[in-house]
Amino acid sequence: MPSYLSFARFYDGLMQDACYEKRCDYILKLAESFGHDMGITLDLACGTGTLTRLLKKRGVDVFGIDYSMEMLSEAMQSASEEGLDILFLRQKMQSIDLYGTINTCVCTLDSINHLTKIEDVAKTFDRVGLFMDDDGLFIFDVNTVYKHKNVLADNTFVYENDSVFCVWQNTPEDDNKVKIDLDFF
């Protein structure tokens, strides 16, 4: 996944407004509303592991999977710096292979949208289901076609904070896809 080679070192700076604490709270409250015990939890497409670390700090038995070695390197370094013992694995979403079962899987920040073929989405759901306990819970989010057509569309966004300056340019493509070009300075 060459597109993530330089992206990993800027990712956390770019995602400062992602409200990870609120996402973590929401996930835990959602599970609670279903009377669900998080149990062993997979953070699928964990990126730099920010949510993974927050879940761990809240007492969740969590591990992370991502395909980008660069993202995983950032995740492992951050977990180590925070004194957290978290397993991170390099695997593709659509072909995860685990040694046991999970009770919960979370996949946030529109990571499912990075799968551009419906077959890969189906494979991902099948693989998660294969390793999920019978009473398991899969929590994920996606961008909608509406967002792709009306928000991202043919727009350019500029993000600037203390750690990154990014120009985000969207180009609509066929089949409700959007090509995204990111330039970092």
Q: How would you name each of these model-derived features?
A:
Residues 42, 49-95:
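Class I SAM-dependent methyltransferase SAM/SAH-binding core
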Residues 139-185:
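SAM-dependent methyltransferase
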Residues 108-110:
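Residues lining the SAM
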Residues 113-115:
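A short His-aromatic
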Residues 122-134:
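A short glycine-rich, Lys/Arg-flanked "PGG" loop and its adjoining helix->strand segment in the class I
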Residues 97-104:
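A short acidic, Gly/Pro-enriched loop at the edge of an enzyme's catalytic core
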